[in-house]
Amino acid sequence: PGAQRDMSVKNAWNLMREYNAVTLPITNEDGTLEGLITNGDIAKSYMDAYDNTILAKGSPQYLSIAETLESEVIVGNPDEYFTQGKVWIGASQPDIMEDHIGENDLVMVGNRMDDQLCVIDANASCMIVCLGTRVSKSIQRLAQERNVVIITTPYDTFTVARLIYQSIPIKFFMKKDGLITFRKNDYTDDIKEVMTKTRFRAFPVTNSKGKYIGTVSRRNLLNIKKKQIILVDHNEKTQAVDNIDEAEILEIIDHHRIGSLETFQPVMFRNQ
């Protein structure tokens, strides 16, 4: 199936694993193909993890962050987006943290109230409270006044730091230009020729209106069964049907002579 451009990397990866796919086409609301993402693209997304602004560049929704972390937004609007700022782990003393945390940043903290207050005082955009820590009413009220989103998660900070980048929507990583697609009425011989000239393993297939309907892979073409035919009366290539070389000849029945046809397997020849 096609995926929506706002689907998170985590959900896209789960969908690809469910269907054992290496390529996931991305469609818009009316089913028109918009782009695609591969498992290689998802793997490369982790290579940018050293950039602590990559999350904001991907602009995930707070709801998507919460779903990725199997957590809950307890303060703030879950439908808003994290669009600017860096990602921090609040593991230092507050006097050190306040020198680094800036406005609109996202910070992961534990159960220490002074750390939580430091994050709110810095006007961070989001605070993720780890290990299922209960957030006090006073902290929630202060965060509400400062427009700081609070997300609580059962995971530890290390796990959150690993998973949070999976909340980025796949539109941030998808390929949009130079896509190789096929129409459902294209001939397999033509498709094979194109496939041999590219490194991709799977290709989107669309109908005449450009709507995505499925994918075709190299493996699919390897499993194509040739048409089986029996030649009667004439067995010269020039007298046979077009593209006879692409068919599997089972038997030849002819009362003339043996022609010049070649096959990859033994055939039954009856001269009568």
Functional labels for PLM-detected ranges:
Residues G2-N20, T27, Y46, L117-D121, ...:
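The conserved cystathionine-beta-synthase
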Residues A3, V9, W13, R17-N20, ...:
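Beta-strand/loop-dominated core regions that host nucleotide or nucleotide-derived cofactor-binding catalytic loops
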Residues M16, L24-I42, M195, F203-R219:
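A glycine-centered beta-loop-beta connector
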Residues T23-P25, E34, K86-V87, P94, ...:
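Structural motif
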Residues T32-L106, D177-D186, T196-T198:
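Non-catalytic interface/targeting segments
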Residues N39-A56, V160-A161, R219-L231:
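A short, polar/charged loop-to-alpha-helix boundary motif
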Residues W88-F173:
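Feature captures the catalytic cores and cofactor-binding loops of soluble hydro-lyases/lyases
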